[in-house]
């Protein structure tokens, strides 16, 4: 259980170009001239979300830069995430584990990029994804960046882009997949209708480097109604080895897998239920649960205590074959750190409890 801070500190406005968790907060909410019924635009620049060079992603007034506690793995791409709402609009708290209730007119923005791209050791933006909340529901808009990094253009058909970069001290390469509209819906759906994934209080309820709680900052700038409970169950940063191992794996599965392995989602026919709110019961994670699909007779359970070689989930997370990998979409590489976390958790278990 994580507790919301009830004392607000001095609110510092930072307009920065880095990706640290305590920027960028701009407390001016401005319509920006966006007519929601005209969207999506043909180019990203038409929205006026950013000031200066668009590739620098410095948000304009009314665009809030947020961070989840744990992030979805997408072939090691980095992300910048933003929220824009029409003037006077606010989101509402529903529950710890449910999406914030965003008003019509909300636009969610997510940019995917790499640093240290070869051969020139530069930053390269791959794509910017929008989810636009209209009266008819949420709509997708996918923008692919041009070679000069001067703008991104609407393209809902999907494509691949080869890229190589330095990850720490290692050279990595990916045939990076930019999703089609159909692929967006596979992950972003509930009962067949498009929905966002990460903007739940459980994912936002943590202190930024400034010491301010992120949910309280949303309230302070006028983007969230001040109706939060005093306690909110929250995920942790799964990369933090100082956090509880169970909490780390549950947080990892929630952000990487639960969008498909939940009721009325794409893989709801499978026995796993991987939302953070459900994995306090390890059976929902697949511990000592037989898989519904036999790939290899040795894989006797989804998760087998103390034995990664008999655990279906470990096999799927370690695979890059599109017929067997997990997640189904969003990666072509193995998330080595995620697999290591799963191995550590499996090896810590001695029985089915």
Please place each PLM-identified region on the residue numbering.
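Short, well-ordered loop/turn sites that connect or cap secondary structure elements
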Residues: 102-105
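Short, surface-exposed secondary-structure edge patches
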Residues: 97-100
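C-terminal motif of bacterial Sec signal peptides marking the signal peptidase cleavage site
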Residues: 15-18
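Sec-dependent signal peptide recognition
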Residues: 2-9
């Amino acid at each position: 259980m994580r507790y919301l801070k009830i004392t607000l500190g001095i609110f510092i406005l930072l307009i920065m170009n880095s990706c640290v968790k305590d920027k960028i907060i701009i407390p001016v909410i401005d319509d920006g001239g966006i007519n929601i019924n005209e969207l999506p635009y043909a180019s990203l620049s038409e929205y006026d979300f950013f000031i200066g060079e668009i590739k620098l992603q410095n948000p304009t007034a009314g665009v809030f830069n947020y961070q989840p506690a744990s992030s979805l793995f997408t072939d090691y791409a980095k992300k910048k995430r933003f929220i824009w709402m029409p003037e006077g609009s606010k989101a509402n708290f529903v529950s710890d584990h449910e999406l914030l209730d965003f008003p019509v007119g909300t636009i969610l923005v997510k940019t995917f990029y790499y640093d240290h791209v070869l051969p020139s050791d530069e930053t390269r933006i791959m794509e910017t994804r929008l989810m636009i909340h209209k009266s008819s529901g949420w709509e997708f808009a996918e923008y692919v960046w041009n070679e000069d990094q001067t703008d991104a253009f609407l393209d809902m058909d999907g494509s691949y882009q080869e890229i190589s970069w330095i990850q720490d001290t290692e050279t990595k390469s990916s045939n990076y997949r930019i999703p089609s509209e159909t692929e967006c819906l596979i992950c972003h759906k509930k009962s067949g209708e498009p929905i966002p994934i990460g903007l739940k209080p459980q994912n936002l309820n943590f202190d930024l480097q400034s010491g301010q709680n992120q949910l309280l900052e949303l309230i302070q700038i006028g983007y969230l109604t001040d109706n939060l409970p005093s306690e909110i169950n929250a995920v942790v940063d799964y990369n933090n080895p100082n956090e509880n191992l169970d909490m780390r794996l549950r947080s990892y599965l929630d952000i990487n897998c639960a969008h498909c392995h939940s009721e009325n989602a794409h893989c709801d026919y499978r026995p796993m239920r991987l939302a953070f709110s459900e994995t306090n019961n390890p059976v929902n994670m697949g511990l000592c649960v037989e898989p519904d699909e036999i790939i290899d007779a040795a894989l006797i359970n989804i998760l087998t205590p103390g034995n990664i070689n008999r655990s279906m989930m470990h096999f799927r997370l370690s695979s890059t074959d599109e017929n067997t990998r997990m997640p189904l979409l969003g990666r072509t590489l193995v998330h080595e750190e995620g697999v290591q976390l799963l191995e550590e958790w499996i090896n810590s278990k001695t029985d089915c409890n």
